[in-house]
């Protein structure tokens, strides 16, 4: 159940109740692609840094260790020891971006595993079956994430097929949830709006998928090559056509600035690999922008990454020490940076929710964006 608690302009402060707990939105989903956050971060760490919901990848877990094995072990929650909500993406993005020699038909997609090259077929039914075996809280519909700069004819054909796939996903999910041995009979299904940067195609698709009465709706196919301005323009035009009584999810986005701007356009859910990926390379986020701990000026810096930060890294270690660990290629350095970045993102969302509740989001966003430019000017 989705309940809007407060609005401030187009920004929404809401809560989304699931069988695995209630999520306070806007929220950032911490990305654990293979049922773990890259950077030696455990689910016990996620509890400590305030993570509300985790995201795992259908394609990767299907390939290794196998969704049937995870079902045999009681589902993804038990497998990774996580009792809060989990969203699984459909595998579509990976099929269309990572896998080699793919062949698209109405039935689905045949492609090669990125691990050993063996052929895999995945269509709407297969994606739903895999996600049902995982038992995630929220399953994403199987879709084609077309390149942002694909021509209009290709995008239109892709969107029409994605809609037909969504109808099949809904039917299959209903069947799977009714089975006596299903891991999570309350599994939810989110549909995905596609259409590249063609707003008229996206709006038409948004209207069509809205009629299917799903548990939530995502805007997909962005942050794949278009400019930020194009992405925001899509959100400005499309989000108003998605159901306002259901959560809205912007897939794969993004930077702190992207999140601030997109919340202002009505988005509830976000996910992105940036916090963990950048952290593993010594790039850490602060309210004054992103800094590179490999920079020589931090060699003798005794301050934490960010003053006042409550993360395990900032509470215990200096920039100089973390820089030393990174230079020495000690895994602890990478782990501390990832923990800090995830804490930063989670805390940013806490501040965003408070600003909306208090009716001051416009000013909060403006100040936050201004502060983030500080390091860029040094």
Curated annotation (Swiss-Prot):
Record keyword Transferase present: yes
Catalytic activity: 7-aminomethyl-7-carbaguanine + guanosine(34) in tRNA = 7-aminomethyl-7-carbaguanosine(34) in tRNA + guanine
Active site: 89 (proton acceptor), 271 (nucleophile)
Pfam families: TGT
Region of interest called RNA binding, as start-end residue ranges on this chain: 252-258
GO terms assigned for molecular function: metal ion binding; tRNA-guanosine(34) queuine transglycosylase activity
Matches recorded under InterPro entries: ArchSynthase1/Queuine_TRR, TGT, TGT-like_sf, tRNA_ribo_trans-like
Top-rank taxon, per record: Bacteria
Cofactor note: Binds 1 zinc ion per subunit.
Listed name of the protein: Queuine tRNA-ribosyltransferase
């Amino acid at each position: 159940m989705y309940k809007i608690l407060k609005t401030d302009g187009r920004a929404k402060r809401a809560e989304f109740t699931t069988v695995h707990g209630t999520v306070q939105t806007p929220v950032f989903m911490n990305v654990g692609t293979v049922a773990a956050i890259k950077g030696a971060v455990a689910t016990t760490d996620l509890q400590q840094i305030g993570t509300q919901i985790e995201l795992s990848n259908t394609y990767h877990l299907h390939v290794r260790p196998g969704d049937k094995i995870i079902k045999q072990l009681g589902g993804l929650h038990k497998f990774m020891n996580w009792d809060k909500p989990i969203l699984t993406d459909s595998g579509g993005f990976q099929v269309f971006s990572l896998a080699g020699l793919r062949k698209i038909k109405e039935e689905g997609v045949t492609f090669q595993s990125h691990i050993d090259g063996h052929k895999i077929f995945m269509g709407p039914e297969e994606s739903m079956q895999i996600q049902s075996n995982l038992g995630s809280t929220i399953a994403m519909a199987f879709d084609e994430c077309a390149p942002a700069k694909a021509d209009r004819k290709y995008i239109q054909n892709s969107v029409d097929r994605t809609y037909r796939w969504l109808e099949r996903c809904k039917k299959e999910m209903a069947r799977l949830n009714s089975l006596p041995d299903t891991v999570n009979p309350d599994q939810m299904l989110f549909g995905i709006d596609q259409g590249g940067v063609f707003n008229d195609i996206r709006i038409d698709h948004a209207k069509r998928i809205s009629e299917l009465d799903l548990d939530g709706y995502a805007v997909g196919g962005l942050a794949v090559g278009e400019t930020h301005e194009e992405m925001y323009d899509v959100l400005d035009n499309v989000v108003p056509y998605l159901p306002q009584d259901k959560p809205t999810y912007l897939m794969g986005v993004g930077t702190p600035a992207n999140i601030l701007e997109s919340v202002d356009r009505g988005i509830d859910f976000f996910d992105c690999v940036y916090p963990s990926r950048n952290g593993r390379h010594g790039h850490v986020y602060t309210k004054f922008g992103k800094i590179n701990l490999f920079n020589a000026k931090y060699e003798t810096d005794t301050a934490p990454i960010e003053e006042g930060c409550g993360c395990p890294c900032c509470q215990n270690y200096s920039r100089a020490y973390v820089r030393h660990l990174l230079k020495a290629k000690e895994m602890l350095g990478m782990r501390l940076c990832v923990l800090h970045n995830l804490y930063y993102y989670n805390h940013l969302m806490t501040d965003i929710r408070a600003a909306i509740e208090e009716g001051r989001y416009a000013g909060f966003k403006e100040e936050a964006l201004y502060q983030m430019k500080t390091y860029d000017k040094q």
